[in-house]
Swiss-Prot record:
Its main location: membrane. Induction: Expression is sigma Y-dependent. Induced upon nitrogen starvation. The chain crosses the membrane at residues 5-25, 37-57. Keywords: Cell membrane, Membrane, Transmembrane, Transmembrane helix. This is Negative regulatory protein YxlD. It is a multi-pass membrane protein. It is found in: Cell membrane. The keyword Transmembrane applies. Together with YxlE, is important for negative regulation of sigma Y activity, being the major negative regulator. GO terms for cellular component: plasma membrane. The gene is yxlD.
Length: 68
């Protein structure tokens, strides 16, 4: 592996790990299957984050009456 490939791989791993941690913590705060969202967030990026927004955050905001 070249140095560039190693840097890209490490950066991708950090992005996916940060996404998984964020999804787990936020889903736990909203009581929405925290473990499932955390594991799904570790699989790939950015689709789980986009799905989480449309399936959890957006309905939760509508439920609470918070406008974006």
């Amino acid at each position: 592996m070249t140095q560039t490939e190693i840097i890209i791989t490490v950066a991708a791993c950090l992005i996916v790990l940060a996404q998984g941690i964020f999804l787990f913590i936020d889903a736990k705060k909203r009581n929405h299957m925290a473990w499932v969202w955390g594991i799904v967030g570790l699989i790939q990026a950015p689709m789980p984050l986009i799905c989480y927004y449309f399936f959890v955050i957006r309905p939760d905001r509508k439920k609470r009456g918070i406008k974006q």
